[in-house]
Amino acid sequence: DYAVTISREAVQLANPPSGEIERQLDNLATCAQTMLSQAIKAFNDLNADLAEGTMGMSDPVEHNLNEIYDAMMGGEAGSDLKELFAIFVIFTNLKRVVDQAKNLCEETIFAVTGVQKRAKVYRILFLERDGSFLAPMAEAIGNKLMEDTGQFGSAAAEPAEIERGAVEFLASHGMAMPRTRCQSVADLTTHELASQHVVIGLDAPVDEYIEKMPFHASALSWQLRGIEGEGEARYESAYRELAVRIRDLMSLIRGDE
């Protein structure tokens, strides 16, 4: 079905893709074909090692897709909407081939070892102006509560030292802060941003921190400005609200997994 759809869209193109679009198309097509071929072989041979290695080939695909979408939005695929849509459909279906190959590898591993499909790990990034309180606390809470299904990080526009009181509060709840400052938003690489599933602004909208969001990532604004109390009470108030919101978020994005 994917091959038929790709072929149907390809014949709609007035000219073959060129430049960056052509390069990315070749890369993704090669990856999809190789993964599918190896996945089928792994399944037929009941080769769990080959299946595991093949699954790893899918890791760069999400990053490459962001480069593809950026190139398309930048005009490298032309401005004709019909052509843009056709190219988008082609890339999307190649990505689905990669996904199906990965699924087949997971079935192979289960058949050979009895190991169930690994839970998908969602990457969540919290943003705060100075990163002195809310963002590092949200990161610590997320990694404590959802360590099997979430990978949480934090960044700040103008990183300041994390409040000592916040560090002590988290320590009293069994959570250690591995650094004294958040990473700077300016230091986030394109790959780091592209790997995020959700980016959350805690004291301002995400677009005040990140001008260009990755194509597939979701931006949320929690606007936690009204944390009440002082000292321990302030940290407790933030802790309770962040814990509830993080649990609700993970429940929403994981669905029935």
What role is predicted for each listed range?
Residues 209-257:
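Phosphate-binding/catalytic loops
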Residues 114-115, 143, 186-191, 208-212:
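Short, flexible, glycine/charge-rich loop motifs used to bind or transfer phosphoryl groups or to couple energy/partner
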